[in-house]
Amino acid sequence: QAAPVLDHIQRLFEELNAFLKVNKSPDYSFLYDQVVSYGELLSTTIIHLYLQHKGIQNQWLDARTTVKTDDYYRGANLDWKRTQEAILASVSKNELVITQGFIGSDANNFTTTLGREGSDYSAAIFAFALNAVSVTIWKDVAGVLNGDPRVFEDTVLLHQISYREAIELAFYGASVIHPKTLQPLQRKEIPLFVRSFENPTAMGTAVSKGKTLEPHVPCYIVKKDQVLLRLSSLDFSFIVEDNISDIFALLHQYKMRVELIQ
């Protein structure tokens, strides 16, 4: 029974090896996306074949054929119109679909990745396109906590939280959910459940419209390895909009994320 699985895996490795032999691009971000995407392709292939072996019929879908993006590698921006059309044309609501998170493709069909927490974002993308009833994301924590349990003692599970509160927490650095994941769900008011795969019967955290932070506790976020960049003009004049635009263009060019401006 192992032979078909190994054959599929071998073909993926051969595909990757063929790309590496002909690749001439010096762009690290481009090369990164072409290579790391194979982790998702390999793992979903194994799951797909395992379920087939157990008699559970399912459709293996290459997310690169449906999630369409620009060519901003390692943090690609979604083409929502093309993506929705491709998903609706490829996914049957009556089938179990096994697909990848984190990856897509650009207009030239080169692989792209969606950045930090891109797999969760992929789930939200498919949910948005398919008008899903809800989305459940399985994590190694009980749900959304009011602080990082590796830093703070006696952290509290947030049972219910609104989209706005979850986006605010995520924006300021809470790592369980990424703001990009929440935005498409909020637009269609699709509830999000964050649950623990270590305790699958526990309810975890529910994120939905109109839910207030429950219980009412303060939330703490710690960011490590931050860099403070202080800018001033040589002629002591104010930094105005044109200067700020130039600064952010450079930061964007070098894929540097700004956490706070003062």
Where are these regions (language model features)?
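A broad, low-specificity signal marking well-ordered, structured residues that form hydrophobic/aromatic
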Residues: 97, 112, 192, 205, ...
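Short, glycine-/Ser/Thr-/acidic-enriched flexible segments
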Residues: 103-104, 119, 142-143, 199-200, ...
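A conserved regulatory-domain signal marking ACT and ACT-like small-molecule sensing domains
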Residues: 204-262
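Nucleotide/pyrophosphate-binding catalytic subdomain
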Residues: 1-177, 182
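Flexible, glycine/charged-enriched surface loops at secondary-structure junctions
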Residues: 4-5, 177-180, 191-200, 254-262
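Conserved dinucleotide-binding and phosphotransfer motif residues
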Residues: 54, 188, 254
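Generic beta-strand/beta-sheet core signal
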Residues: 61, 99-101, 138, 195-197, ...
